[in-house]
């Protein structure tokens, strides 16, 4: 396994208590980073702390669909850790497994709000914190569904396509600064979102 040197780096991982988020958190801790998990499920966040068992890992309960909360929690991290180097936008939901014609509008909006709008909110809020130190790395977790468009998963596919477009736009906007913005598009993996899709 390739080793990365993240000593003295401060990272935030949204949805970091389980699934991809927890795997990312564990790898960052192994690489020397200080990590703050953002999750809405305190029970899972506490389990993650017990599993990882590192003094470099903490958590905050954060609703990433609330822009004011995001700004407030970023300020808390900056105050406690001195800076924010890395931000991983990982939190998300699968949404309903149904056709476009039968997709309830309210449920569609929930998926778009958490999977796309929340990523925009977090990116918008964290960039000024990174710009202060002329350094930043933002990674947005999308999905192969955002490229291919999965049947019976229109809201999820659309939200992840939006994340890909947002990542490209923001990356170009910050190209002259020392803030890199990238996107990862995983295929299916056995996570809570996978379970939601196959219920």
For every predicted segment, state its role.
Residues 123, 159, 167:
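Active-site helix of classical SDR
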Residues 143:
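Residue(s) in the substrate-gating loop at a strand-loop-helix junction
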Residues 98-100, 107-109, 194:
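Substrate-binding pocket helix/loop in short-chain dehydrogenase/reductase
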Residues 4-35:
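Canonical Rossmann dinucleotide-binding motif of NAD(H)/NADP(H)-dependent dehydrogenases/reductases
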Residues 97, 101, 148-154, 176-177:
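Active-site loop immediately N-terminal to the catalytic Tyr-X3-Lys motif
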Residues 128, 172-176:
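Alpha-helical segment proximal to the catalytic Tyr-Lys
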Residues 42-43, 61-73, 105:
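The beta1-alpha1 cofactor-binding region of Rossmann-like NAD(H)/NADP(H)-dependent oxidoreductases
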């Amino acid at each position: 396994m390739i080793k990365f040197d993240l000593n003295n780096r401060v990272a935030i991982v949204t949805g970091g208590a389980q699934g991809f988020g927890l795997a990312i958190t564990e790898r960052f801790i192994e690489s020397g980073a200080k990590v703050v998990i953002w999750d809405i499920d305190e029970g899972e966040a506490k389990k993650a702390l017990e599993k990882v068992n590192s003094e470099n890992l903490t958590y905050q309960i954060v609703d990433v669909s609330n822009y004011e909360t995001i700004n407030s929690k970023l300020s808390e991290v900056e105050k406690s850790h001195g800076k924010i180097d890395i931000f991983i936008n990982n939190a998300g939901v699968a949404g309903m497994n149904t056709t476009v014609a039968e997709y309830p509008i309210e449920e569609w909006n929930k998926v778009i709000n958490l999977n796309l709008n929340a990523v925009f909110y977090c990116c918008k809020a964290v960039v000024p914190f990174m710009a202060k130190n002329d350094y930043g790395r933002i990674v947005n977790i999308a999905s192969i569904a955002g490229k291919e468009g999965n049947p019976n998963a229109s809201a999820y596919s659309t939200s992840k396509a939006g994340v890909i477009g947002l990542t490209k736009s923001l990356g170009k906007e910050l190209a002259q600064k020392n803030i890199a913005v990238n996107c990862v598009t995983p295929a299916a993996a056995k996570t809570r979102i996978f379970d939601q899709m196959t219920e």
